[in-house]
C-alpha cells in the first residue's frame, strides 16, 4: 500500500499486523450493476469523505476501512493522517491519538487497536492510498 503527499511523491506503508477486516475503500464504482457488479465502496461514505477532507484529499480518494480492530502500519516517513468513525485504541509509538482531526506523524509505527465504541473506522492519509483502479474504483471489496 502506498501514499502520496503530491502526485510526484509516494511512500510505501508496510503492514506490520493486519486487522481482521481491513481493506481499501473509496466511494465505490458506478455503472456496472447491469453486469452484476455491486457499487461497493466505504460503508459510511460520509465518514470516509470527512477523513479525506481533514487531510486535504478529494472526497473520493482511497482510505483504509477497518472493522472491530485495525492494523498496525509502519510509516516510512512523516505523513498527515486522520481517523474517523468509531473511536479505536489508536496509538503512534505508544502515544494515544485523537479521532476526527488531522494529525502529522513522523516515521514510525501506527497501531489501530480494538474499538472503544462503534464498529468501523476509516484512516485517511494525505495524498490517498495508491492502489490499482479496477472498473474505476480503488475499493478492494
Label each residue range with its predicted role.
Residues 1-141:
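Conserved "landmark" site that anchors the functional core of diverse proteins
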Amino acid at each position: 500500500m502506498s501514499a502520496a503527499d503530491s502526485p510526484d511523491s509516494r511512500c510505501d506503508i508496510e503492514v506490520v499486523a493486519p486487522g481482521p477486516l481491513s481493506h481499501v475503500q473509496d466511494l465505490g464504482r458506478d455503472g456496472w450493476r447491469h453486469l452484476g457488479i455491486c457499487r461497493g465502496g466505504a460503508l459510511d461514505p460520509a465518514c470516509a469523505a470527512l477523513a479525506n477532507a481533514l487531510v486535504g484529499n478529494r472526497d473520493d480518494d482511497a482510505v483504509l476501512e477497518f472493522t472491530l480492530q485495525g492494523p498496525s502500519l509502519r510509516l516510512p516517513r512523516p505523513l498527515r493522517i486522520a481517523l474517523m468513525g468509531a473511536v479505536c485504541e489508536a496509538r503512534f509509538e505508544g502515544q494515544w491519538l485523537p479521532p476526527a482531526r488531522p494529525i502529522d506523524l513522523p516515521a514510525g509505527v501506527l497501531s489501530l487497536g480494538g474499538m472503544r465504541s462503534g464498529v468501523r473506522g476509516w484512516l485517511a492519509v494525505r495524498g490517498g492510498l495508491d492502489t490499482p483502479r479496477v472498473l474505476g474504483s480503488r475499493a478492494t471489496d
